[in-house]
């Protein structure tokens, strides 16, 4: 079903998210955030392949998110402004992968523990407001 390259890419992406989360928990540790970014991007390349990854990041409607995501990585690596780099990078990440959030939420709702939390009336109402797209969730 999945090739070995895609399995390695999924693991690298998961490790990238883990190291990024750990970098945020450790008060924006620059080295862990940089390692997380490197692993996440290389994992995406291995999952999709180089040609599809280039095609994904170069889409006309996603070019703003691509520029912000990679500019945030550059700010994080080159300067000492880790917080600014993370904010820029997260904004770019949301612009790039925001279309997939409803799919991820519907998958998470089917999981045993997380599904119960997401189906709670307060959380469910918040997610429905965020999904409508025309109003803020708060």
UniProtKB/Swiss-Prot annotation:
Major location (coarse): Golgi
UniProt gene name: golt1
Family: Belongs to the GOT1 family.
Disulfide cross-links: none
InterPro entries the UniProt entry points to: Got1, Vesicle_transpt_Got1/SFT2
GO BP terms, alphabetized: endoplasmic reticulum to Golgi vesicle-mediated transport; protein transport; retrograde transport, endosome to Golgi
The organism's taxonomic lineage, starting at the top: Eukaryota, Amoebozoa, Evosea, Eumycetozoa, Dictyostelia
Membrane topology: Multi-pass membrane protein
This protein's GO CC annotations: cytosol; endoplasmic reticulum; Golgi membrane; membrane
Record keywords: Golgi apparatus, Membrane, Protein transport, Transmembrane, Transmembrane helix, Transport
Subcellular location: Golgi apparatus membrane
Family annotation (Pfam families): Got1
Residues passing through the membrane, by range: 8-28, 31-51, 63-82, 88-108
Function: May be involved in fusion of ER-derived transport vesicles with the Golgi complex.
UniProt-recorded name of the protein: Protein transport protein got1 homolog
Ranges facing Lumenal side: 29-30, 83-87
Segments in the Cytoplasmic topological domain: 1-7, 52-62, 109-138
Domain of life according to the entry: Eukaryota
PANTHER family listed in its UniProt record: CGI-141-RELATED/LIPASE CONTAINING PROTEIN, GOLGI TRANSPORT PROTEIN 1-RELATED
